[in-house]
Structure formats: C-alpha cells, structure tokens
Swiss-Prot record:
It comes from Dechloromonas aromatica (strain RCB). Its cofactor is Mg(2+). Its main location: cytoplasm. This is Ribonuclease H. Mg(2+) 1 binds at residues 12, 50, 72.
Length: 148
C-alpha cells in the first residue's frame, strides 16, 4: 500500500452541555487531497458526536481502503478495539447485562469499519495536534450552524 492509497482520518466531537447541542468534525486526507466534514445535532451527547464523526468520515470513503483514523476519544478507542467484540457476542448487552449505550451508532460504525482496513490511533485532545485542533474547530462549527 503506497501513501497515495492510504487514507488519514482525524475526528472529533463536541457538546455544549452533556446532553445538549453537539457537533462533529472530520478531516480526510488521501495523498494531496483533503476533505472536511462537519455537522450537528440539537440534543445529543459528547460520546454520540465522537462516534458520529468517525461514522460520517468512514462513510465518505468511496471505496475500500487502508489507513489510520485518529481520535481523542478513549470511549471510541476502547469501544472499537476492545468492548465491541463482547457486546456483539452478548447481543449488544454489557457484561452486566445492560443495553449498550449508543448501540445504534456502534452498530453503524461496526458495519463501516468492516469495509476498510483501518488502524485506530488515540491522540491527546487539546494538546496542539494540528489536525485534532482542526477537527475540534469543525465540530464546534457544527454546533454554531445549529443556531443559524
């Protein structure tokens, strides 16, 4: 796989109040090409926006591809890499038999991830990582546009 065939995705979610108005942002980079995506919801949570950012970014890929997806969300990282296998085995229930929170979004993310070969990478939020800062700005733009 050459660099030209490898996508880099940077995602972030934001919420004003939790729950409250929220936004999500994503940057997709393939070779010299970049695409910015963002959106918002009137009543949501930060975790739902983090998940939505990843889902919308992966949905935007036009064909199966390999690459890296960067998130500052431990919830998304642990969910996609560790917890999801048990949830699926348990019929979307947690180990203590409670329904998985945000199961609708986890199921969408799971379906999208299967189409690609993505490595998930955690980055510390608000620590000067340029693309994470841009994704955060896009997420906040999603919130601002709700007011429009």
């Amino acid at each position: 796989m050459t660099a030209e065939e490898t996508v880099e995705i940077f995602t972030d979610g934001a919420c004003k109040g939790n729950p409250g108005p929220g936004g999500w942002g994503a940057i997709l980079r393939l070779g010299p090409h970049e695409k910015e995506l963002w959106g918002g919801e009137k009543e949501t949570t930060n975790n739902r926006m983090e998940l939505t950012a990843a889902i919308r970014a992966i949905e935007a890929l036009k064909r199966p591809i390999g690459g890296k997806i960067y998130t500052d969300s431990q919830y998304v990282m642990k969910g996609i890499n560790e917890w999801i296998h048990g949830w699926k085995k348990n019929g979307w229930k947690t180990s203590d038999k409670k329904p998985v929170k945000n199961a609708d979004l986890w199921q969408l993310l799971d379906a999208q991830v299967k189409l690609h070969k993505l490595e998930w990478i955690w980055v510390r939020g608000h620590s000067g990582h340029p693309e994470n800062e841009r994704a955060d700005a896009l997420a906040n733009r999603g919130i601002e546009e709700l007011k429009g």
